[in-house]
Amino acid sequence: MSVVTLKKCRVVSGGRPVPAPFAPTGAHGKQPRKVSTMYPLNGAVVLVTGANGGIGTQFVHSALARGASKVYATARTPRSWDDERIVPLALDITDPDSIQAAVKAADDVTVLINNAGASVATPGILTHSDAEIRNNVETNFLGPLFLARAFAPVLTAKEKSAMIDIHSAMSWYAVGGIYSATKAALWSVTNSLRLELAPEGVHVVGVHVGYVDTSMAAHSTDPKMDPVDLVTTVLDAVEAGEYEVLADQTSVQLKAGLSAPIEAVYPQLARSKS
């Protein structure tokens, strides 16, 4: 994959992000604590949600390959690992008690990776069941938010720390029903967390990507990104101190579409007006 690095943003070739014209400040205008803009994984203690497979498993392996001293590999029912540096940890991000137990068990974390997510079988938001809507809201939005809030004191207590939120290109493309809606909400939360945690030295990174070659995307015949390539791109960005990762052309194009007329993004709306 060809990648070009711009100020505080990593995109695949052809992207056109515009650097922010102002430095991030906290909720009350406090300037960020002076820390290095580099965030090496060497020696880090990492917690990965949704670590049992797919992207989560790759984050576990790649963090260790970059020198992480320990990785908490979390899931509702965590799998076993053949590496003493990997600590299986039960965590249900939709359960407040489970979140608090994880904070207590993993109070040495320096990098939090919000990777766990849910999807739906059909895209129509009006046809989703109540259970599908609640599951996506709790897993894709409230869970990562509550986990970030719970771990914020742990991360701010460290000399250097980072948080990585895995969004989706569907954050900017509303054809995925409740999945798109919850990923858009998480994107907004990540932006808020970044501003509030920057003054405390916590670097918050948002990741956008289209389909990735995992079981969650098995239904799609569209091109898919290899999890290895995705995680490599993300961790390169984290170590470079970047704020946002647009991991594929789909993400680049959809973000650019935010400033386009809505009929250009959704041609069916233009047809309905004719």
Where are these regions (language model features)?
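N-terminal Rossmann NAD(P)H-binding glycine-rich loop of SDR-like oxidoreductase domains
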Residues: 52, 56, 60
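Rossmann-fold cofactor-recognition segment
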Residues: 83-95
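Active-site loop of short-chain dehydrogenase/reductase
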Residues: 108-109, 155-167, 199-203
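Conserved mid-core segment of classical short-chain dehydrogenase/reductases
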Residues: 119-134
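Active-site helix of classical SDR
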Residues: 148, 182-183
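A short, exposed helix-loop element centered on a Lys and neighboring polar residues
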Residues: 148-149, 191
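C-terminal helical subdomain
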Residues: 206, 214, 218-260
